[in-house]
Amino acid sequence: MDLESESSALESVDDNVLIQQSASNVCDDGRSLDNGSCSDESVKLLSTSNSVELGKPMSFDSPGDGGGAYSPVLKGQGLRKWRRIRRDLVKDTSANMENSKALKRGLSGVAHSHGKQMQFQSPEVEQESQGSVGSVNMLKSSGDGFDILGSSGYDSRFVAGVGFSAGMDLEIDDDRSSKSSTVARAPKVIRYEKPMISSGQGGNIRVENSKKHRGESVDFEKENSYSSLESDSRKQSGRMMDYNGENGETSMRKDDAGGEGGESINTDNRYSDEMDPLTEAINGFLALQDALEKEVQQFQEIGNEPMPQHHEQVSEANSPHPEIVTLVNNVEQLENMLEETRSMLEVKESHIRDLESTTNQSKHSWGGTEIVVEDIFRQKIEAEIEYLIYSRSIDNLNSQMKLIDEQESLAEEQTHETLNKLGRVQTKAANFTNRAQDLQNDCIEITGTIKKRACKITSYVLIQLVLLSTVVLLLLSQLLPEPDTVVPT
């Protein structure tokens, strides 16, 4: 694929050089192409218009390095074939990336007006690639008559308007998440071969179609439109995330030809959730405008270079005024869309101002309520502390009451036990008293009986002694003899 695209590019450039040689036969200032590296931007755009390689960055040479004219190098008799020398590609610079994107977005033809040559894109590619930044490839006029196709010089107003409208279209396409929706919405125009248009000294417009157009160029252009749409959407999403995230402020700059000053929208970080759609739209506009301004500056540098007059005597072709009319209509439609978006942004700005005013009022009203809330919060904390203290004291008292109740229950049990013991002792004492009385009664009875027995015994003993004495006396009297003398009585 790469070899075919490079060979087709070299063959198209060879054909153009042969046509130029046959038309002029003599070079203007004798300057030659230096091993395929030409300082003329139009020749490079022409050679890479139909077969630009996808994903491969291409670098523009500086406008002032070489002269404005060129001529093929003569070697002996005839022309020398172009010999391509591989260049050192710089992939990291932003200028090369943007230039490659500009080429991939469909820079197609070179138009020449008042000694200057430019490139013009076919209407189908123009319509298909409206979703990207470089879809509408126009050159900003710098006051020296740099016109499109030799007539109706467009100023930077159309370019800026187209850039902003393309940004809106890209926003819609990103929301729908469909690449094919942009192609489906774009009007289709019958495809024709890309001409190289030049104007002679007499004002005649002559066109020469390139001879060798390969069938793969159509596929390349369609893939370029799709890849440009995807790359722009990725680039836009990346810039929207990185844009001015520190202070939360976004600014929207108006286009150059509108004459309106820059307007800025200051958003607060607290309302970032509500402002996401608006900030995304504004960031997309700013990113698209920056990319478009860079492309316009590059086109101005290309247009300010002196161009050779090698294409003065080529065959005529039909004038592309209908295409210009369609482009103007498209630009007007895009400007209308831009006005609508501006009105929507103004409405959103008014809504943001209303929200800010309401927030400021709420802040002032919150100033007094905060003190009340703080007092209530302080009272709440004090009440909670008191509640904790009381709850703890109540818990302690409850525990003490439980202990006292337990002690009372124990005391009651002890009193019951003691009362029971006392009852038992009293019953025992009563029993003992009864026994004592019984014993006393028994003792009295025993003593009475003993006394009676003692009296009886003593009476018996006395009686027995008396009897004994009488008996003894009787015995003695019998034993003893009776005396002889008589005692006188």
From Swiss-Prot:
Residues spanned by motif Nuclear localization signal 3: 104-105
Region Disordered, residue ranges: 49-73, 195-264
GO BP term (any one): nucleus organization
One GO MF term: protein homodimerization activity
Segments of skewed composition (Basic and acidic residues): 215-224
Record's keyword annotation contains Nucleus: yes
Stretches of the chain forming a coiled coil according to its record: 323-446
Keyword Transmembrane helix among UniProt keywords: yes
Record motif Nuclear localization signal 1, residues: 80-81
Compartment(s) where it occurs, according to its Swiss-Prot or TrEMBL record: Nucleus envelope; Nucleus membrane
Membrane topology: Single-pass membrane protein
GO CC annotations, alphabetized: cell plate; nuclear envelope; nuclear membrane
Record InterPro entries: WIP1/2/3
Residue ranges of the TM segments: 460-480
Tissue expression pattern: Expressed in seedlings, roots, stems, leaves, and flowers.
Superkingdom, taxonomy of origin: Eukaryota
Domain KASH: 459-489
Record key words, sorted: Coiled coil, Membrane, Nucleus, Transmembrane, Transmembrane helix
Function: Mediates and enhances the nuclear envelope docking of RANGAP proteins mediated by WIT1 and WIT2 in the undifferentiated cells of root tips. As component of the SUN-WIP-WIT2-KAKU1 complex, mediates the transfer of cytoplasmic forces to the nuclear envelope (NE), leading to nuclear shape changes.
Record's protein name: WPP domain-interacting protein 1
Gene: WIP1
